Amino acid sequence: MSNNSRHYSAIDEAILQGQAMLETLFGKPVAQRENPAKGLSQPALTSAEKKQSIGFMRVNHSGEVCAQALYHGQMATAKNPAVRALFTTAAKEETDHLAWCQERLEELGGHTSYLNAFWYTNSFLIGLLAGLSGDPLSLGFVEETEKQVEIHLADHLRKIPSNDLKSRKIVEYMQQDEIQHGLNARSSGAKELPYLVKKLMAFHAKVMTTLAYWI
């Protein structure tokens, strides 16, 4: 029986979610796909350029921490096995993003956000609430989240130094994946979220991106 269709007890689910949190926050993520920046010849960056790139890649890494938490929260409460499978697949692809961002941060000499445990906990609870609202709204939450993430990534591509080829290549690949995740959610029956919920999501994202850039 596949993991997607297997029934877990509440204790099993809690153990699985705890393991996922620890792996995300303290483990070294392993990508299933090759880093798109691998093999690129990277020109030298000035100190100012490197500092700027570190800030944006730290934000992107924290965004992927949030994505892991959101998807795991939604997986834990999904009613339809097909919806749970969709979340599981998306979470695996987001793990690739997490690994790529972490690898690039290390190359740049930067650190991940010191607030990642807070981001994860907060996002996991949001994912649980989204899932408990029913699969259509949970899928709508994914669609809206990915729309907002794609906008953030497009903004980063305008601001990351033009000669930071590796960071830009990673962000470009991430952007395409996020667009596809949103389309997948829509085609699976996503229900549009209320306007106020969208605004609250944007505010939450603004707080995270602002703080993670520096801390």
Swiss-Prot record:
This protein's pathway: Cofactor biosynthesis; ubiquinone biosynthesis
Binding site for Fe cation 2: 94, 146, 178, 181
Location in or out of the cell: Cell membrane
Gene Ontology molecular functions: 3-demethoxyubiquinol 3-hydroxylase activity; metal ion binding
Keyword Membrane applies: yes
Functional description taken from the UniProt entry: Catalyzes the hydroxylation of 2-nonaprenyl-3-methyl-6-methoxy-1,4-benzoquinol during ubiquinone biosynthesis.
Entry-linked NCBIfam families: DMQ_monoox_COQ7
Protein name per UniProt: 3-demethoxyubiquinol 3-hydroxylase
Organism ancestry: Bacteria, Pseudomonadati, Pseudomonadota, Gammaproteobacteria, Legionellales
Gene: coq7
